[in-house]
């Protein structure tokens, strides 16, 4: 794959002839823009993004302020890095900030039809309404309680039968993948372990492409430069594999007209979408490609977010033995005489819920959220922001804001025992799942998986690092991607707990 340095050189070379066309008019130059770092000709501030952009942008924002203006290639970009600025924008200008930029990999892999990346407009409104009312309603999420319980039980059995340390990263990804497969497709997998592994591999490659660097996202007039990025062929390959998979899933569901699946309580996600597709009263006609786009939303968000969060939680608890002990004592004191923690127990596990919140603060799944785009000119704190500006909300930086958090770099779950701050988009100090119209509608889908799995892992086992490793050896480095995973897999020794 061509290196980023070579790409920058090629960009400089090929854009020389387009300088005049890319220059902004004089009137726009006179705009009072937010402060930002000096930019290079042609590439702007692209060279300052680094391999983990949320970290680089946090560093730059510490120097230039919580509202920062960058030029990423030919794309004007606003970076929001404090709770105060997030509150100003999303309380007073949410509709203006609800657009989405056109991103190459997301458009291709999502059939231009995902709810997450759809432009702000009628299609997005109608599909989001369908998702909230039909797929993510409290009643629908509750209907899958048995699926979550059964899959967590299988996870516990796998761990109990293991000899030696277990790769918790792989096990939790398999857990969330199986849960989403059953909820979305009606089956744990379509034909066995090999097929489940295939789905898992497709999702990993999809995540890699969504987090990949495609030149056209920063130089829209130079789309042909994508061929030099080294990702184009990989993107097309995974798209074909996914498309064939989703085609087969839809065909199987259309062919399956058994009475067992006719009741709403037996419907999976594909059943619901096919039913809605046939409804003549729908405001928009839904195509098969749009059904596939919704499935991409559910698979990508439903598997990666939950599994990454569970691993960050277990990693932080290993690093903080007192917190681990308190969490285990809480769940073991509450749940007695039962083999497993059930979802009805979760509301009483206040400390464990605080642990989850603290980890979402320190390790938001998508630290820059999904990029937004301003739909019209607007003024923020006296700064004039032009339409079509891309917006990056640095949720990680906001959650580390010392104006809002005491000792923000420390792992302190206790802070949430006395604080009403939550992660559902109502508090601007913490936005791991976004805020406003474009906030993630699937948070209530993912969190029962995280909490049920975590509570049972702590209830059933004592955990420690493999022999010979100390807390100081636990690698907490982040991996590159649209969802931030722990780079090194988490291997732990599990000892069954005996009351």
Curated annotation (Swiss-Prot):
Binding site for heme: 440
Gene3D superfamilies to which the protein is assigned, alphabetical: Cytochrome P450
EC code: 1.14.-.-
Compartmental location: Membrane
Name of the top EC class for this enzyme: oxidoreductase
Keywords: Heme, Iron, Membrane, Metal-binding, Monooxygenase, Oxidoreductase, Transmembrane, Transmembrane helix
Required cofactor names: heme
Membrane topology value: Single-pass membrane protein
UniProt key word Endoplasmic reticulum: no
Induction of its expression: By fungal elicitor.
GO molecular function: heme binding; iron ion binding; monooxygenase activity; oxidoreductase activity, acting on paired donors, with incorporation or reduction of molecular oxygen
Main location: membrane
Spans through the membrane: 2-22
The keyword Iron appears for this protein: yes
One Pfam family in the UniProt entry: p450
Signal peptide boundaries: none
Alphabetical list of InterPro entries matching this protein: Cyt_P450, Cyt_P450_CS, Cyt_P450_E_grp-I, Cyt_P450_sf
Domain of life: Eukaryota
Gene Ontology cellular component terms for the protein in this record: membrane
Family assignment from sequence similarity: Belongs to the cytochrome P450 family.
Protein's name in the database: Cytochrome P450 71A9
Organism annotation: Glycine max
């Amino acid at each position: 794959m061509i290196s980023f340095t070579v790409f920058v050189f090629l960009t400089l070379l090929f854009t020389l002839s387009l300088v005049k066309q890319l220059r902004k008019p004089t009137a726009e130059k006179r705009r009072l823009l937010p402060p930002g770092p000096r930019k290079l000709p042609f590439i702007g501030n692209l060279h300052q993004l680094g391999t983990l952009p949320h970290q680089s942008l946090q560093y730059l924002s510490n120097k230039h302020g919580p509202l920062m203006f960058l030029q990423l290639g030919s794309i004007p970009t606003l970076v929001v890095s404090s709770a105060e600025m997030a509150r100003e924008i999303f309380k007073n200008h949410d509709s203006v900030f609800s657009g989405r930029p056109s991103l190459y990999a997301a458009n291709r892999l999502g059939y231009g039809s995902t709810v997450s990346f759809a432009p702000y407009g009628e299609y997005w409104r109608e599909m989001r309404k369908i998702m909230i009312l039909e797929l993510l309603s409290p009643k629908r999420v509750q209907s899958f309680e048995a699926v979550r319980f059964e899959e967590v039980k299988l996870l516990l059995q796998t761990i109990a039968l293991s000899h030696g340390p277990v790769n918790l990263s792989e096990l939790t990804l398999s857990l969330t993948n199986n849960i989403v497969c059953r909820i979305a497709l009606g089956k744990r997998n379509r034909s066995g372990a090999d097929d489940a592994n295939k789905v898992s591999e497709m999702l990993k490659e999809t995540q890699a492409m969504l987090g990949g660097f495609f030149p056209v996202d920063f130089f829209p007039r130079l789309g042909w430069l994508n061929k030099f990025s080294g990702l184009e062929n990989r993107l097309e390959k995974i798209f074909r594999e996914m498309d064939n998979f989703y085609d087969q899933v839809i065909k199987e569901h259309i062919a399956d007209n058994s009475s067992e699946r006719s009741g709403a309580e037996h419907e999976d996600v594909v059943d619901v979408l096919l039913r809605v597709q046939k409804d003549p009263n729908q405001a928009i006609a839904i195509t098969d490609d749009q059904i596939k786009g919704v499935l991409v939303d559910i698979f990508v968000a439903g598997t990666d977010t939950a599994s990454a969060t569970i691993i960050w939680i277990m990693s932080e608890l290993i690093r903080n033995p007192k917190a681990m002990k308190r969490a285990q004592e809480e769940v073991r004191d509450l749940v007695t005489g039962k083999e497993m923690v059930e979802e009805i127990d979760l509301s009483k596990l206040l400390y464990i819920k605080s642990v989850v919140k603290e980890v979402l603060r320190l390790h938001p799944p998508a630290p820059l959220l999904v990029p937004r785009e301003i739909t019209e000119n607007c003024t923020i704190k006296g700064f004039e922001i032009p339409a079509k500006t891309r917006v990056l909300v640095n949720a990680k930086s906001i959650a580390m804001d010392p104006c809002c958090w005491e000792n923000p770099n420390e792992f302190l779950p206790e802070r949430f025992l006395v604080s009403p701050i939550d992660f559902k988009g109502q508090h601007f100090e913490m936005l791991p799942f976004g805020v406003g119209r474009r906030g993630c509608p699937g948070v209530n889908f993912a969190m029962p998986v995280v909490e049920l799995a975590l509570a049972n892992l702590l209830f059933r086992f004592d955990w420690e690092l493999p022999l010979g490793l100390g807390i100081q050896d636990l690698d907490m480095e982040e991996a590159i991607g649209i969802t931030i995973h722990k780079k090194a897999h988490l291997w732990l020794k599990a000892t069954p707990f005996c009351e």
